[in-house]
From Swiss-Prot:
It is a single-pass membrane protein. Its main location: membrane. PANTHER family: ATP SYNTHASE SUBUNIT B, ATP SYNTHASE SUBUNIT B', CHLOROPLASTIC. The chain crosses the membrane at residues 4-24. Keywords: ATP synthesis, Cell inner membrane, Cell membrane, CF(0), Hydrogen ion transport, Ion transport, Membrane, Transmembrane, Transmembrane helix, Transport. Belongs to the ATPase B chain family. GO terms for molecular function: proton-transporting ATP synthase activity, rotational mechanism; proton-transporting ATPase activity, rotational mechanism. F-type ATPases have 2 components, F(1) - the catalytic core - and F(0) - the membrane proton channel. F(1) has five subunits: alpha(3), beta(3), gamma(1), delta(1), epsilon(1). F(0) has three main subunits: a(1), b(2) and c(10-14). The alpha and beta chains form an alternating ring which encloses part of the gamma chain. F(1) is attached to F(0) by a central stalk formed by the gamma and epsilon chains, while a peripheral stalk is formed by the delta and b chains. It comes from Azorhizobium caulinodans (strain ATCC 43989 / DSM 5975 / JCM 20966 / LMG 6465 / NBRC 14845 / NCIMB 13405 / ORS 571). This is ATP synthase subunit b 1. It is found in: Cell inner membrane. The lineage of its organism: Bacteria, Pseudomonadati, Pseudomonadota, Alphaproteobacteria, Hyphomicrobiales. It comes from the Bacteria.
Amino acid sequence: MSDMELAELWVAVAFFVFVGILLYNGVHKALAKALDARGARIAAELDEARRLKEEAQKLVAEYKRKQREAEAEAEAIVTAAKAEAERLAAETKAKLEEFVSRRTRMAEDKIAQAEHQALADVKAFAADAAVQAAERILAASVPGTATGDRLLGQAIQDVRGKLN
């Protein structure tokens, strides 16, 4: 055996002795225990991460549901507001039409009253003119006697009664 082979042999022997000492002192148990603890810690972290992921998914689902509900509620509010606006517009239009109709009727009534009054004034004026004309004609045709004045007064009263 050469020196080189002898050195390799001693390194191998030293290695096996070292491993034997480690095994004898229970280092392998401590190492296994440390690895088991690390594995348990990693498993716990994975379980916690899984639990947090599920919780986050539940929260996301709940927020999406709330968002859909809020959108539906907003849409319902908009629909109700549009319906209310349409109702108010129709009500306002009806009130405006009623107001215009009432004002038109009032104007037509005033016009009819004015026409009636004008017609009555024209009739009264015509009656007075006819009476005055009749007075002049009768006064000219009948001399100024008491009977003539009486007949004239009676005729004037008859004409006034018929014309008015």
